[in-house]
Design a protein with these regions (language model features):
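Positively charged, polar, low-complexity stretches
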Residues: 2-98
């Protein structure tokens, strides 16, 4: 997978920006974690949830990756329903199909 796999046609500008930023994090691992999750939920996020997702996008890759993949404690201000959804989306018991 090289990035965005869905069309952004029909998405409002804010959702398009969020999707783009989720797929262009800086590290490939975080591109995959954030981008795939964003693709799955971008159309259903409320305004408030988009605010929370934007806050997560601002977190440095190393910190966010450690919270998602390495079980490091999540600061209270980032332990939101959107973060928990992102983490749950990537909790699995089989290899990820790249």
């Amino acid at each position: 997978m090289t990035g965005l796999s869905r069309s952004t046609a029909g998405l409002e500008p804010r959702r398009k920006r969020l999707l783009f930023r989720a797929w262009h994090r800086g590290t490939r691992e975080m591109d995959l974690l954030m981008g795939r999750y964003a693709e799955s939920v971008i159309e259903t996020l409320t305004e408030g949830e988009m605010d929370l997702f934007e806050a997560l996008i601002e977190v440095p890759d190393r910190d966010l990756f450690s919270w998602i993949a390495q079980g490091e404690p999540v600061p209270e201000n980032y332990d939101t329903p959107v973060f928990r959804g992102l983490k749950a989306y990537h909790t699995h018991d089989k290899p990820i199909d790249l």
